[in-house]
């Protein structure tokens, strides 16, 4: 028994949870015969997502029968996993009195205090752990992060450098080191040092260090050039190839990244067995990355076919994660959840699986189960406080607030993480009604994002300006009624955060309606139009001028393209809802393609929309959704929105239903009856309980729509009125056409990118 217990502890401490779990299952009955065995089985059950079974085993353990630091240390860890922090602290401290104390006990005490924001206590115990095991890179790294959070950059730098001397390929430590040098204004020194080294001895290691440093510093164009040159000079080194892919992904160059991955996978002669000892495993990971990019680009069928061809696919957590993403894109949230639950059984401590499962469960309204799994994530990774506070509906302890403030204000923490902490902290402070501090934090979070994106409001203004000029009554009259007669699509559109998700969920709870979410098909049609024109022998004009070349054949062809793709998502319901908010840019095209389609436009108080957008950490921040991170940019987008919708109403009188968000919150049944009547749908009582549906919600409104209709967001802007001068000034300015010199700059940027999807990051 003692050798089995020792072996299990060794596996667990080395983070080999897969073998740890298998060994527990193989020796389950044997382990039940001892107190220490029951504790280890409790840990196994917790990692397997079965906290109730862990609690049952814990209740059978007699703490007084444990007479070793090891046994008490495991018991304290199990208490910690189950959220019984006071018991965990008491038992772990009791273990200190025994002679067999090891570095793991001190490390666990450090993690316990760190998770509570008690940095001094955490530092004390992690330093004790390090004194027993000076070469433990994980403890060096944790201490480095702790000193970062305390603002002690030089101490943190020393610890990360020590970790890197022991483990040169420790990427996380390398990133932290770079961030510290960046915050100390010493990044140029490091970059110059690497460039000099590259001139003297241009080897793979220097290319990798330089590329990673530039990437972490946000100098993406330089990083891309370095990785590209390195990959060409050293084609057999996989790290340079992967570095290039990561930079391309960060730059939003999805197509280029996917093309390279496809080339490298089709011809694997570049793989050197010495440099890539696990060749098959490495190529499999590249294959998963390619399919991830395919899913992002909405090539779902291609990705799915390739994933199903993977041999022994059940042995890869990535297979489950990517397959669940495909299911979510197809609005099959329940299937995605079941698949990920199966993955959790096989990989109980895989953070990627657990995080994806939390996301899916939240989207289908299984909030209690999502909270349980989030607690497992925090137990495995105590720094996941941002997600933990989100799951607790932004109710945070004082210690958690301190951690969030530290993350937000630490210049050595990645900007993306700092911004995420800021957006969450804003919601926490808003919930506490500390509105002034909340908005100050929100400004800081948005400014951090702005430093990372390249957005110009004039690009969208120019497209709207040209659309208004091109879509004349004469053009509409020539094409009116020539599109596809289908009544199947219902388009819900308007400014992001105006109530489009709520409206989709109401309609989607009707038995005749399938809520498809934010479909990319209308923007895709717009992007494909030049090729379509060329194919039929017409001048390949870009949008919106392309509408001048349209005829009945092209309209019906575009509509059929849309209907074919919708049919792959659902073939059972007679109606389907497409709720891509920014389809307001393309209402003219939609109503010409589908003259019998229903178009529902959400209108909401401009300032409420402005505040709500500014409060969201949108994932699609590199595209058109970049407008949401600056109050003036939001004002310009609101002006664009108002101008184009006024134009569509003039061209298509009576064909667009105006749904007032405030009226919906005040008179829900009356408004919903009008909505169903407009959509030619019979009344069903179930539409009033839309929030009970298990269909997934994938947008920024993921939590709100699970609570039913609520009025707390109406007139919300008044809390922050004194901060809204920038957006108010732009709204008063109204929609102004760009002048000729400005037009020259933007005439090649016709289609704004990133319209598809605006989920929260």
From Swiss-Prot:
TPR repeats: 35-68, 69-102, 103-136, 137-170, 172-203, 204-237, 351-384, 419-452
Pfam family, one: TPR_16
Protein name: Uncharacterized protein aq_1088
Region Protein sulfotransferase-like, residue ranges: 487-761
Keyword entries, A-Z: Repeat, TPR repeat
Source organism: Aquifex aeolicus (strain VF5)
Protein family (similarity comment): In the C-terminal section; belongs to the protein sulfotransferase family.
KW Ribosomal protein (keyword) present: no
SMART domains associated with the record: TPR (SM00028)
Keyword Nucleus tagged: no
């Amino acid at each position: 028994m003692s050798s089995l217990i020792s072996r299990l502890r060794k596996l667990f401490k080395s983070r080999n949870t897969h073998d740890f779990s298998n060994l527990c299952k193989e020796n389950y009955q044997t382990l039940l015969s001892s107190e220490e065995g029951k504790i280890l089985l409790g840990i196994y059950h917790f990692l397997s997502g079965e906290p109730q079974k862990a609690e049952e085993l814990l209740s059978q353990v007699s703490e007084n029968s444990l007479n070793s630091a090891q046994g008490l240390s495991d018991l304290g860890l199990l208490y910690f996993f189950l959220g019984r922090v006071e018991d965990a602290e008491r038992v772990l401290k009791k273990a200190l009195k025994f002679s067999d104390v090891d570095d793991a006990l001190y490390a666990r005490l450090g993690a316990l205090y760190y998770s509570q924001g008690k940095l001094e206590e955490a530092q004390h115990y992690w330093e004790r752990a390090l004194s027993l095991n000076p070469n433990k890179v994980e403890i060096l790294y944790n201490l480095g992060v702790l000193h970062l959070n305390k603002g002690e950059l030089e101490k943190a730098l020393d610890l990360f450098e020590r970790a890197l001397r022991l483990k040169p390929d420790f990427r996380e430590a390398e990133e932290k080191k770079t961030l510290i040098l960046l915050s100390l204004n010493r990044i140029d020194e490091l970059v110059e040092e690497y460039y000099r080294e590259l001139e003297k001895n241009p080897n793979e290691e220097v290319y990798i260090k330089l590329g990673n440093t530039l990437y972490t510093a946000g100098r993406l164009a330089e990083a891309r050039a370095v990785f590209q040159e390195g990959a060409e000079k050293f084609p057999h080194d996989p790290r340079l190839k992967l570095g290039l892919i990561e930079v391309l992904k960060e730059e939003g160059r999805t197509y280029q990244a996917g093309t390279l991955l496809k080339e490298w996978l089709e011809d694997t002669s570049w793989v050197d067995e010495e440099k890539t000892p696990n060749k098959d495993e490495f190529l499999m990971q590249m294959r998963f990355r390619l399919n991830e990019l395919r899913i992002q680009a909405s090539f779902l069928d291609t990705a799915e076919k390739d994933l199903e061809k993977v041999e022994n696919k059940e042995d890869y957590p990535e297979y489950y994660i990517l397959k669940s993403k495909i299911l979510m894109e197809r609005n099959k949230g329940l299937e995605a959840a079941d698949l990920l639950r199966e993955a959790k059984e096989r990989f109980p401590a895989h953070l990627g699986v657990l995080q994806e499962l939390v996301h899916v469960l939240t989207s289908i309204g299984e909030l209690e189960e999502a909270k349980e799994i989030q607690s497992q994530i925090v137990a495995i990774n105590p720094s996941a406080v941002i997600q933990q506070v989100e799951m607790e509906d932004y109710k945070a302890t004082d210690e958690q607030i301190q951690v969030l403030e530290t993350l937000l204000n630490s210049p050595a923490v990645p900007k993306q993480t700092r911004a995420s902490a800021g957006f969450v902290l804003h919601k926490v402070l808003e919930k506490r009604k500390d509105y002034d501090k909340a908005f100050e934090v929100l400004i800081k979070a948005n400014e951090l994002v702005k430093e990372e994106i390249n957005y110009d409001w004039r690009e969208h203004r120019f497209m709207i300006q040209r659309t208004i000029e091109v879509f004349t009554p004469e053009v509409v009259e020539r094409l009116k009624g020539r599109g596809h007669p289908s009544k199947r699509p219902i388009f819900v559109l308007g400014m992001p955060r105006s109530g489009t998700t709520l409206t989709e969920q109401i309609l989607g709870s009707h038995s005749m309606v399938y809520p498809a979410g934010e479909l990319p098909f209308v923007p895709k049609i717009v992007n494909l139009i030049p090729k379509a024109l060329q194919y039929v022998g017409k001048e390949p004009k870009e949008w919106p001028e392309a509408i001048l070349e349209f005829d009945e054949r092209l309209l019906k062809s575009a509509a059929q393209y849309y209907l074919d793709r919708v049919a792959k998502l659902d073939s059972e319901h007679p109606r389907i809802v497409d709720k891509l908010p920014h389809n307001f840019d393309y209402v003219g095209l939609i109503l010409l393609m589908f003259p019998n389609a229903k178009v529902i436009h959400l209108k909401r108080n401009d300032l409420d929309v402005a505040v709500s957008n500014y409060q969201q950490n949108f994932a699609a921040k590199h595209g058109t959704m970049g407008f949401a991170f600056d109050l003036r940019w939001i004002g310009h987008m609101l002006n664009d929105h108002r101008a184009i919708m006024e134009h569509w109403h003039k061209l298509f009188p009576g064909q667009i239903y105006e749904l007032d968000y405030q009226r919906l919150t005040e008179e829900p049944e009356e408004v919903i009856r009008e909505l169903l009547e407009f959509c030619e749908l019979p009344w069903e009582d179930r539409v009033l309980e839309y929030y009970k549906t298990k269909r997934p919600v994938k947008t920024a409104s993921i939590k709100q729509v699970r609570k039913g209709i609520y009025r707390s967001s109406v007139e919300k802007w008044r809390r922050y009125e004194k901060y809204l001068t920038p957006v108010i000034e732009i709204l008063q300015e109204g929609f102004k056409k760009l002048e000729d010199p400005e037009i020259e700059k933007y005439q090649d940027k016709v289609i704004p990118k990133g319209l598809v999807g605006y989920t929260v990051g």
